[in-house]
C-alpha cells in the first residue's frame, strides 16, 4: 500500500528526539530507494564514512561541521572542514570520506541512496597523531539505522585496530579533549 501520510518534522522531534542517541544520533524516517534520516547532536564518533553514492545534507537547526578527506591532495592538506549552517544544504559526492560533527541542540536531515549491488561502504579511522589510515571496515550497507553504530562499537572493542601502525598512537572511537 502506498504511504500517503506526511510527517511533520517539528512534531516528530517534539515527541521523539530521545531516539536520536549516540554515537550516530540518527533515526530513519523513510526507506525505499532512498533513506531519509533525522540526525541530532551532539554525536560521538571519530570515523570517516565512505559512501559509494552521494549524500544530501540539510541543516534544519544550528550548524554542523562535515570533516572530509580530499584524496586528490596529500598530507594534512587533504583534511578539510565544511561548515553547514542552519538552512544550508550540501551535496557530498560519492566516495568522499567524511566525519559529520554535530553539536548540542542541532538537527539535520540526511538523504542517502540505497546501495547498488556490489557497491560497499567503508568506515575509516585516521590517526589523530600522524593522520595516516589506522583502520578500515568494508561492508554492504543494508541498514543505516544500525550498521554504522555496529562498526563504531567494533572499533571501540579492538585496541589492536585502534593503534596506528605508523606512529603507535592509540586512537579512540569517540572524540577526546586532546584529539586534533
UniProtKB/Swiss-Prot annotation:
Keywords: Cytoplasm, Dioxygenase, Iron, Metal-binding, Oxidoreductase, Pyridine nucleotide biosynthesis
GO cellular component, one term: cytoplasm
One GO BP: 'de novo' NAD biosynthetic process from L-tryptophan
Catalyzed reactions per annotation: 3-hydroxyanthranilate + O2 = (2Z,4Z)-2-amino-3-carboxymuconate 6-semialdehyde
InterPro entries on file: 3hydroanth_dOase (IPR010329), RmlC-like_jellyroll (IPR014710), RmlC_Cupin_sf (IPR011051)
Annotated positions binding a divalent metal cation: 127, 130, 164, 167
Residues in the signal sequence: none
Keyword Oxidoreductase: yes
GO terms for MF: 3-hydroxyanthranilate 3,4-dioxygenase activity; ferrous iron binding
Claim: Magnesium is one of the keywords in the record: no
Cysteine disulfide links: none
Annotated localization: Cytoplasm
UniProt-annotated binding residues for substrate: 55, 102, 112
Binding sites annotated in the UniProt record for Fe cation: 49, 55, 98
Required co-factors: Fe(2+)
Enzyme nomenclature, EC number: 1.13.11.6
CDD domains: cupin_HAO
Pathway(s) annotated for this protein in UniProt: Cofactor biosynthesis; NAD(+) biosynthesis; quinolinate from L-kynurenine: step 3/3
Sequence positions that bind O2: 45
Chain's role: Catalyzes the oxidative ring opening of 3-hydroxyanthranilate to 2-amino-3-carboxymuconate semialdehyde, which spontaneously cyclizes to quinolinate.
HAMAP family cross-referenced by the UniProt entry: 3_HAO
Family: Belongs to the 3-HAO family.
Protein name in UniProt: 3-hydroxyanthranilate 3,4-dioxygenase
